[in-house]
Amino acid sequence: MAISQPVIYTVSRLNNVVRLLLEQEMGLVWLTAEISNLVQHSSGHWYFTLKDQQAQIRAAMFKGQNRRVSFRPQNGQQILVQGQLSLYEARGDYQLIVEKMQPAGDGLLQMKLEALKARLMAEGLFDPRRKRALPTQPKQIGIITSPTGAAIHDMLTILARRDPALPVILYPSAVQGESAVPALLNALETAWRRNECDLLIIGRGGGSLEDLWCFNDELVVRAIANSPIPIVSAVGHETDVTLSDFAADLRAPTPSAAAELVSRDQQQQLHRLAQYQHRLQQAIQLRLQQHQIAWQQQYARLNTQNPRYQLQQKIQKQDELQFRLERVMTQTLVQANQQWMSQHQRLQQVSPKRQLPNLQKQHAYLYQRLLNAMQSKQQDSAQTLSRLSGQLHALSPLQVLARGYSVTTNAKGELIHSSQQVTTGEMLNVQLHQGTLKVRTEEVKSEN
């Protein structure tokens, strides 16, 4: 029976195997301890010892991770860290490679926060499919925050600058301390009950994790997620993230950013009004061109037909088209005036006064141009119609009769063009300019 040979390690190989076992088996661990022997190396890496009353462990935190630490650790400070157990192979030192570091108090809150976040996320409370689109043009917005904080001042300043006509209702609430949670819930319920806003902003300025904790409270988070009114969460600075941000329909990095997101820019409104005015002018011009083409087509048909009856029909048709044109132009002008008046009233609320007279002058100028164009077109049409009627009258068969000519027909009403169509003794009708003669043929002569 063969005897298995023992595995013989080198020191470096053994340390490597132990390091891999530690990293693979233990994974990431959370550790609360006192920091000591802190060395901040010129390379940017930190080396220190973590200890309690009975034991200690070496630790290292590299530059890429310690740059995200929000405080300066001190020897003797109680901290909470998350890291990977490992082994420094060159010396065989068992150590912790730290990835996250927080003061012990904030660290416990952070652990509590992560646990609640995971539970609510598992319930689907933060599912993006639950989120609603914000109204593009809110009629009235509500703000839930402290009435004395910097956040409300910043938001009101931005809203007044961007959209001074947008009504804002403040639902005052504490945003820090033990009274904050019931106050926030009461403010939300008040906004829902009164139902006077179609968009809510909830938030405050920056602070520590403990200061912002009311926005991580489960009752507040659930209330925001189930709000019947769309909510924008605007808590703290851009780096501050609360569970309210995940539950809201939209997260704004700061209260000021929230005010920017929900308001309409006054300059954009003026630009949109100018676009509407340009489109109206184009529509009126197109309608004029269409009716001008229709009139020209009718004119061409009239010009190819000579009898008076057809002329009368075309005149009536022309009158009808002219009436329809006037009615359409009147309706278009009324609609244009109504639309302008509506935009004018809104502009009075949001536009600087010095811009309003210019818009009024421009409107009056365009309005007068439109009236002048209509009157000129109507006069041209009347003159053209009068000229055509005179031409048709001059070419009428009745005018030929007035010059001494006559029209002869037989008893069947057939026109007589040649003596060969007539027999001796046949009765004929002679149409004069004034009156009709009935004659009998005495003699028929043919001209060679």
From Swiss-Prot:
Write out the GO biological process terms.
DNA catabolic process
Could you tell me where this protein is found in the cell? Cytoplasm
Please give the catalytic activity noted in the UniProt record. Answer: Exonucleolytic cleavage in either 5'- to 3'- or 3'- to 5'-direction to yield nucleoside 5'-phosphates
One Gene Ontology cellular component term attached to this UniProt record is: exodeoxyribonuclease VII complex
CDD domains in the record = ExoVII_LU_OBF
Identify a single GO molecular function assigned to this protein: nucleic acid binding
Task: Give the keywords, sorted.
Answer: Cytoplasm, Exonuclease, Hydrolase, Nuclease
The EC number on file is: 3.1.11.6
Q: What is its main location?
A: cytoplasm
InterPro entries, per database record: Exonuc_VII_L, Exonuc_VII_lsu_C, OB-fold_nuc-bd_dom
Domain of life of the native organism: Bacteria
- The family this protein is said to belong to: Belongs to the XseA family.
The UniProt subunit note reads as follows: Heterooligomer composed of large and small subunits.
Show the PANTHER family listed in the entry. Answer: EXODEOXYRIBONUCLEASE 7 LARGE SUBUNIT
Could you tell me what this protein does?
Answer: Bidirectionally degrades single-stranded DNA into large acid-insoluble oligonucleotides, which are then degraded further into small acid-soluble oligonucleotides.
Q: What is this protein called?
A: Exodeoxyribonuclease 7 large subunit
Q: Which gene codes for it?
A: xseA
